[in-house]
């Protein structure tokens, strides 16, 4: 699943390519991928000029003058910016026809991704964005006390809590493993047992890892690969996720499922 750094990489490429172009038509081949009524969505997106792209957490925001189209890639979503002779395969579910003659194709093998339109006045006050937690790449001074209350209000493993997008936006399975390793926190620890100092470390390490991963254009492993000519390199800097040995103490890393998600950690370095 693309996490914040991968979505930011997509945003940067699409912002460069699409800004100033109009969406002239839309082919929707799998209607369930559109959260809105189809006619409402088309009426509010067709003939709109893309003035830029923004992002909040894992949500891409295609900005128009009077509103925005939101896209969430979920597990397998990918965009292809292509010429009109591009071969349309069965996994391409939405095709945007652009004013320069090119196509923006959305491919999603799992069909989990979603699109919707929101007016400017409701963009951040209605779902999905109203439910998104703090984005540490945009907020350099988050309220630690508020985050501490949200986290310690839960008794589930801290790994599972940090995957909740209403707390820290953009963290997914890969980066939660890395953040907890750098913070010396066992992913099985109950969330209500973390200290406010632990939360501060989680925030600091999330910021650091997000920024480094963005500089390296994200992590390219398993199903997340580039569809826009950009290959991520951060997989070369991962400390524990998919690894077998702790880089610090050289112990064999633990590989176990927590909340249904494969998790990697060092039981000696993480308490």
Question: Where are each of the predicted segments found?
Answer:
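A cross-family signal for N-terminal binding/gating loops and helix N-caps
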Residues: 1-107, 112-114, 245-248, 261-271
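Basic, nucleic-acid-binding surfaces and adjacent catalytic neighborhoods in DNA/RNA-processing proteins
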Residues: 22-41, 54, 59, 70, ...
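Phosphate/anion-contacting hairpin/loop surfaces
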Residues: 65, 69-170, 175-182, 190
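Catalytic cores of large soluble enzymes that bind and process phosphate-bearing ligands
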Residues: 2, 6, 139, 198
